[in-house]
Amino acid sequence: MDQSLIQEILEIVEQAAIASATLSGKGLKDEADALAVDAMRKRMNQINMQGKIVIGEGERDEAPMLYIGEEVGTGNGPGVDFAVDPCEGTNLCAYSQRGSMAVLAASDRGGLFNAPDFYMKKLAAPPAAKGKVDIRKSATENIKILSECLGLAPDELTIVVMDRARHKDLIAEIRATGARIQPISDGDVQAAIACGFAGTGTHCLMGIGAAPEGVISAAAMRALGGHFQGQLVYDPAIAQTSEWADMTKEGNLQRLAEMGITDPDKVYEASELACGEHVVFAGSGITDGLLFNGVKFEADCTRTSSLVISNMNNTCSFTTTIHMKDGAQSIALN
């Protein structure tokens, strides 16, 4: 991948964010997601690359576009694998709540873990704690390590956890250490990445979320130098979700075996989930969030706020783009 391709990757998430944002606050989460998918795919297919969706909207028979295995791009140029979530936090977008964004991870061919549509236990932490905290340790132990690595008392730490019934015991354990809980309803990618930046007020992400988004988070944290680990969750009793009401632990283990995953309890490091030589993360806000603003529609332009993290040149770029309308008369600087 070269710098010109990274610019086009930025434009992919910008277009998806703009499309979704047209329905922000209108209670239409499926429609907002569909618009983002269409816009993302359209921009991808204009790029000179041999792109492939390795994590997308589902299996081929479940999703009409951006399905797993779909080829995107013109068919010329470099081979690029994509993990995409065109509208992460569809509920957040639908009800104009904070934290919805269009996101993707890109790498050279074979550089991203083909995560099954399962759940994943996740641990994200700042670079200072990389390799010191561990997902196999208790929350209490990890908070003690974080406190030492960051030079903060436990009661000065903020831990992000998704607001789910399955996290009741985890939340109680975290609070017992004195640390603060920041619950989120959806969209843990932005929370994971925020752990990699000082000054966000987010020090750690713990708990269980979707596995595909875990790969996207891992790509960002690998490029950023932060800590990320993931472990697949296959037991419905642990996932505690209505989506798995008809599934069994044994059936899920069989599904993983059929996918070639021989060690279902393996702990994956960021460098294993995003193992490519070149790894790029790109995200663009749909609604305002922790790292960047959402889409702003103005009389003469549309503004997007985005983040691109690349290990190719070890850069993080926060970008505000002004998309000018035809016949624009006056563009405000901010």
From Swiss-Prot:
SUPFAM superfamilies noted in UniProt: Carbohydrate phosphatase (SSF56655)
Pathway annotation from the record: Carbohydrate biosynthesis; Calvin cycle
Residues annotated as binding Mn(2+) 2: D85, E88, E213
Presence of the UniProt keyword Metal-binding in the record: yes
Signal peptide coordinates: none
Keywords: Calvin cycle, Carbohydrate metabolism, Hydrolase, Manganese, Metal-binding
Family: Belongs to the FBPase class 2 family.
Recorded GO MF terms: fructose 1,6-bisphosphate 1-phosphatase activity; metal ion binding; sedoheptulose-bisphosphatase activity
Cofactor: Mn(2+)
EC number: 3.1.3.11, 3.1.3.37
Catalysed reaction equations from the record: beta-D-fructose 1,6-bisphosphate + H2O = beta-D-fructose 6-phosphate + phosphate; D-sedoheptulose 1,7-bisphosphate + H2O = D-sedoheptulose 7-phosphate + phosphate
Recorded superkingdom: Bacteria
NCBIfam families referenced in this protein's UniProt entry, alphabetically: glpX (TIGR00330)
Pfam families xrefs: FBPase_glpX (PF03320)
GO BP term, pick one: glycerol metabolic process
Top-level EC class: hydrolase
InterPro entries, sorted: FBPase_class-2/SBPase
Binding-site positions, Mn(2+) 1: D33, E57
CC terms in the record's Gene Ontology section: cytosol
Protein name stated in the entry: D-fructose 1,6-bisphosphatase class 2/sedoheptulose 1,7-bisphosphatase
Record's subunit section: Homotetramer.
Function noted in UniProt: Catalyzes the hydrolysis of fructose 1,6-bisphosphate (Fru 1,6-P2) and sedoheptulose 1,7-bisphosphate (Sed 1,7-P2) to fructose 6-phosphate and sedoheptulose 7-phosphate, respectively.
Annotated positions binding substrate: E88, G89, T90, Y119, R164, A165, R166, D186, G187, D188
CDD domains named among the record's database cross-references: FBPase_glpX
